[in-house]
Regions:
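Catalytic core of nucleotidyl cyclases, primarily class III adenylyl/guanylyl cyclases
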Residues: 1-11, 25-66, 92-96, 114-116
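Amphipathic alpha-helical segments that line or abut small-molecule/effector binding pockets
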Residues: 10-21
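Polar/charged alpha-helical tracts
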Residues: 24, 63, 140-144
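Solvent-exposed, flexible loop/coil residues
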Residues: 53-58, 63-68, 72, 103, ...
């Protein structure tokens, strides 16, 4: 069965900021068990993929395609604690997020990939000083850019 799903790169940016914030809060609390510190690198790209369930006895869901390989490349060439996005994602995200150009990075047997760090939401779209939580202005701009209201954003705005 084939179907098309259109999650937006802006959603991926918001999810990445949330993950980054969660890891930062965990690290700031300290670790009473003295386990190794958790480091997180996030790479984001967007494009067509093929998905499916594989396996005969033990089933697993997986995705394949150039977009998956480029997202993996973005993550592999990221620094710990940062979010690395492709030029395509940056084009979708630049209106709402602060981006830091990194320049092109050569990929083996492929073209160079232009990369950007996604640092935070722009201050006018953020409800916190760190730029991790969207505000109501963000919700209106998101709706204008994507043509749909952000999923569960209104609930997120009301929670601490």
């Amino acid at each position: 069965m084939l179907f098309r799903s259109l999650p937006h790169p802006i959603d991926a940016g918001l999810a990445a900021l949330e993950m980054q914030g969660t890891v930062a809060r965990m690290k700031s609390r300290g670790d009473p068990l003295r386990l190794p510190s958790l480091e997180l690198r996030i790479g984001i790209h967007t494009g067509p993929v093929i998905s499916g369930v594989v396996g005969n006895r033990r089933f697993a869901f997986d995705i394949w395609g150039d977009a998956v390989n480029i997202a993996s490349f973005m993550e592999a060439h990221c620094l710990a604690g940062r979010i690395n996005v492709s030029d395509i994602v940056a084009g979708h995200a630049k209106a709402l997020f602060e981006l830091e150009p990194r320049g092109p990075v050569e990929a083996k047997h492929e073209r160079a990939h232009e990369m950007f760090f996604l640092n935070r939401l722009k201050p006018e779209f953020s409800s916190d000083q760190h730029g991790q939580r969207p505000n109501e202005t963000f919700a209106a701009e998101y709706d204008r850019l994507t043509g749909r209201p952000p999923s569960q954003l209104t609930e997120d705005l009301s929670s601490p």
